[in-house]
């Protein structure tokens, strides 16, 4: 009886140790891996402070992206309220940032983006408001962030307007 008890104990000790090994140090074969859907293309925009911001500034960071415009009266205020909640949860994460791109760069100048960021009380070290050339902003929205179907692109950039309720 002693040998049988010892064998059972040994079996369960090995089983528990094996379980903990695979749980904490072993392969992550059981973890779900997210597929890469798109890569960010090279770009350069201006922040609310007039500083350049490029795709290289996003390297190694988890980034939440949105498109909005400062004089929007429909979905944008609600989106930015939701974005404030996201920011509150992740603001202390060292590799987290939010990028709010304008979809109306003719009106949303650097100065206007600064006023808007200040009105939200945004911490602009980790939540940046970006403006730039309309064709560049829209190209990145479609090709990198997948916020709009590239088939929606019209011949004239002046006739285009991306206004979406989605975050990327």
Please describe what each predicted stretch is.
Residues 1-46:
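N-terminal targeting signals for export/organelle localization
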Residues 34-35, 54-56, 119-121, 158-159:
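Short secondary-structure boundary/capping segments
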Residues 40-41, 63, 164-165:
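Short loop/turn microsegments at loop-to-beta-strand junctions
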Residues 46-47, 168:
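Hydrophobic alpha-helical segments, especially N-terminal targeting/anchoring helices
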Residues 53-83, 99:
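Short active-site neighborhood of thiol/selenol oxidoreductases, capturing the structured segment around
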Residues 80-140:
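Structural microenvironment flanking redox-active thiols in thiol-disulfide oxidoreductases
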Residues 134-168:
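Thiol/disulfide oxidoreductase modules built on the thioredoxin-like
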């Amino acid at each position: 009886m002693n040998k049988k008890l010892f064998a059972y104990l040994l079996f369960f000790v090995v089983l528990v140790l094996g379980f903990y090994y695979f749980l904490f140090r072993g392969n992550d074969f059981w973890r779900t891996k997210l597929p890469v859907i798109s890569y960010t293309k090279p770009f350069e925009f201006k922040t609310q402070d007039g500083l350049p911001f490029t795709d290289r500034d996003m390297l190694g960071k988890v980034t939440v992206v949105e498109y909005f415009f400062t004089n929007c009266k429909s979905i944008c205020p609600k989106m930015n309220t939701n974005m404030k909640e996201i920011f509150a949860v992740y603001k202390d994460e060292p590799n987290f940032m939010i990028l709010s791109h304008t979809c109306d760069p003719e009106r949303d100048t650097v100065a206007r983006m600064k006023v808007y960021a200040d009105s939200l009380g945004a911490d602009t070290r980790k939540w940046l408001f970006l403006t730039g050339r309309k064709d560049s902003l829209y190209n990145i929205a479609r090709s990198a962030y997948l916020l709009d179907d590239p088939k929606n692109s019209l011949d004239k950039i002046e006739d285009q307007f991306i206004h979406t309720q989605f975050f990327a």
